[in-house]
Regions:
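Conserved beta strand-loop-helix elements of the APE1-like EEP
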Residues: 100-104, 184-195, 215-218
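Short Gly/Thr/Asp-enriched flexible loops that form oxyanion-binding sites at enzyme active sites
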Residues: 62-65, 96, 138-145
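Active-site beta-strand/loop microenvironment that shapes enzyme catalytic pockets
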Residues: 113-155
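A short aromatic-anchored loop/beta-hairpin motif
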Residues: 1-88
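Short, basic/aromatic-enriched C-terminal tail that caps enzymatic domains
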Residues: 208-220
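Cap/lid and interdomain-hinge subdomains that line or gate substrate/regulatory clefts
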Residues: 79-119
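Polyanion-binding loop/helix "lid" in catalytic or ligand-binding cores
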Residues: 37, 160-204
């Protein structure tokens, strides 16, 4: 049993139109690419889709719920059917759950946040990685401008485009921290998966000064 396919999507809540409101059109291209990637992922025939994000290590079962209320939007999401569980999903997993709902995926779903290595369950898994690159691409970026950010994001994009797990594992953690790469643990967890992979980079963007990627990995 193994990870049979993976997709990477942005972790920005601005991907969700209800959150972005008047700025929703600014991420329209990323949103379309993310929908495409998730549709491919859910068609991979895995027994379970696992949504993976960065954060303190935790696991979330099918039916776990979350909300965007912390961003002023009373939008509730869940991993699979909403069975009324308390809203405990962290933001990256809320975004993953929202994207899965848009595809009308009705299969088994779970979630996990990682701060290091991740071991896949003993079933065939499709992995939805919710992660951004740097937050320093422009002066108005969340982390302000840093001239090193574009090159760092370029390394991420190249690794995603070529299914290069070693390149993801080798990303400089110290520099990533300086460039506010909150998605590094999730990207490294993806990189730790045994290949080879047939990969495609669907989007590479820096709207709002944040490195954002959409990619699909399938077993070669």
């Amino acid at each position: 049993m193994s990870v049979v396919a993976a997709a990477v999507v942005p972790s920005s809540p601005m991907l969700v139109p209800d959150v972005a409101t008047g700025a929703a059109s600014e991420l329209a291209t990323l949103r379309v690419a993310a929908d495409d990637a998730v549709a491919r992922l859910t068609a991979a025939g895995a027994e379970v889709v696992v949504v993976l994000g960065s954060g303190p290590r935790a696991a979330y079962a099918h039916g776990s719920a979350g909300t965007f209320a912390g961003l002023g939007v009373p939008l509730r999401v869940s991993l699979g059917d909403d069975v009324g569980e308390p809203a405990t999903l962290p933001l990256p997993l809320c975004i993953g759950a929202w994207l899965l709902a848009r595809t009308r995926y009705a299969g088994l779903t779970a979630g996990v946040t990682v701060d290091g290595a991740w071991a896949s369950p003993d079933v065939d898994v499709a992995l939805l990685v919710v992660a951004d690159g740097t937050a320093c691409r422009t002066e108005k970026a969340p982390g302000a401008f840093d001239a090193r950010a574009a090159a760092f994001d370029g390394h991420i994009a190249a690794a995603l485009a070529h299914g290069d797990g070693a390149a993801l594992r080798g990303l400089d953690a110290g520099l990533a921290a300086e460039l506010h790469v909150g998605g590094l643990p999730a990207l490294r967890a993806l990189g730790a998966l045994e290949g080879p992979w047939r990969a495609e980079l669907l989007a590479d963007d820096a709207t709002h000064g944040v490195g954002s990627f959409v990619a699909c990995w399938e077993r070669a």
